Structure formats: structure tokens, C-alpha cells
């Protein structure tokens, strides 16, 4: 359960970083 949550958090983090890089 904790690992699945961690995967979702990491996935969301990558998505945010991707959007930031896209804006730059």
C-alpha cells in the first residue's frame, strides 16, 4: 500500500517537472 502511494507521488512529481520544463 505504501509503495503504491509512493509510486503515485513520484509519478505526480515527474508530471509537474515535465510541465515546468515545458514552460521553460
Swiss-Prot record:
Family: Belongs to the ponericin-L family.
Keywords: Antibiotic, Antimicrobial, Secreted
Tissues expressed in: Expressed by the venom gland.
Role description: Has a broad spectrum of activity against both Gram-positive and Gram-negative bacteria. Is inactive against yeast, erythrocytes, and insects.
Highest taxon, organism lineage: Eukaryota
Protein's name in the database: U1-poneritoxin-Ni2a
Places the protein is found: Secreted
GO biological process: defense response to bacterium; innate immune response
One term under GO cellular component: extracellular region
